[in-house]
Design a protein with these regions (language model features):
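Active-site-adjacent substrate-binding region
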Residues: 35, 44-125
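Acidic/histidine-rich catalytic neighborhood of metal-dependent amide-processing enzymes
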Residues: 1-58
Length: 125
């Protein structure tokens, strides 16, 4: 979604693209969506994914159980992280089960000139 990180720019709020997208969905379309899985910031070489605290818990548990059975228990942490204002929020607000797969804490170079491709890991991706 576009304009996810636009908050702070004069006249803009956060998560603009996903908010607009969900606002355009019909009631029947919303009812037809089983889940929304947001994959955000998953390229870090030291990837750790706690359970983002505003995400749908049952969906998280399903995904984390699958990850654990596939040997990714060291990445998908059995701990609750902080709530993140992210593109899953409008879907949650519309009643769609949603999770945010996001690496936290954010690395020191996040949103700086040092946030470059060399920080990404093919293994994490």
């Amino acid at each position: 979604f576009d304009a996810e990180d636009s908050g702070g720019i004069d006249g803009w709020d956060w998560i603009q693209g996903s908010t607009h997208y969900v606002s355009q969905l019909s009631t029947s379309r919303i009812a037809s969506i089983n889940a929304m899985i947001l994959v955000d910031m998953v390229g870090d070489s030291e990837l750790r994914l706690p359970k983002e605290s505003s995400s749908t818990r049952s969906l998280q548990n399903d995904i984390w159980n699958i990850a654990d059975s596939l040997g990714y228990g060291n990445t998908f942490l059995d701990s609750i992280g902080t709530p993140i204002l992210d593109d899953h929020r409008p879907f949650l607000d519309a009643g769609i089960p949603s999770i945010d797969l996001i690496h936290v804490p954010f690395p020191w170079y996040w949103h700086t000139l040092e946030d470059t491709p060399d920080k990404c890991s093919a293994e994490s991706l």
